[in-house]
């Protein structure tokens, strides 16, 4: 039997201890310590980060980050005032690329740069497709207190920030059967075999919807269990009684190498698996009594050919969960609430890199968990 360990490094002090709440596994699973050297700090140009909206590791093992410059706390923006009221800081561009060592490689984007397309009011989700293009979306489903419009779109850019495509647009939702507008879409994945973009359209709608990734032409859509999506107001499921026949916050979507499509039904604490045509395959439920943010935030696949494991972000329990992809079995679980290095506060997303390390995003930071023991890719 093994126990997971995490090294918590802070300033010049470090200690190593057992991670609380670990489920011991009978088979080899990856083990992690915190890499407190990532990213390289301070960030250049006196940059400060707002809320982290999405992260993704590309084919070059680079971490891409999407944050909201407009949500950098005002007290941190003294340098950007006219005249300056402090030595720190200015809001960083919305999209930042880091190498595996944590160095900033390039950065671009933000609402002030949006010309000819609709920048999201409340950013959500980042994905890098097989061509290297960057996809971002937004989760706002109604008019904001500041008058900002609902987010009904996903945007596609080249790696250097050139606008390429907008699917949907601003405006209130017309419902889960409308194919012209999204409603608080949370995430996308692009299938290299068909060049189709699969969208988790889940904060306002209750569906997976598929478009051509170059033209934006609508292809198909489905709801829970592969049935037509509906907008019935259903309570969240706690694992008792019959499972609901509708999604409740479709928060992630990932296409595996074998063609299976994994969908996170966040507030119902489950993953549903489909064929690419929407045919239902399987359902996996995790910590069904979890309320709050739910137990199924997002998944990422282990970087071997078989994609042996998935890492599951459990935001409601502040956990990282390692799952065997073949049958959805939970193999290990670690993590704890807190704001110290190595702890989680509003953990929103977790991603494997090409070496099996894990990046976690939460509020205003990204942490890197370095693989040290157990099975490696």
Model regions and ranges:
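Bacterial N-terminal signal peptides
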Residues: 7-20
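Eukaryotic scaffold repeat domains enriched in small/polar residues
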Residues: 24-377
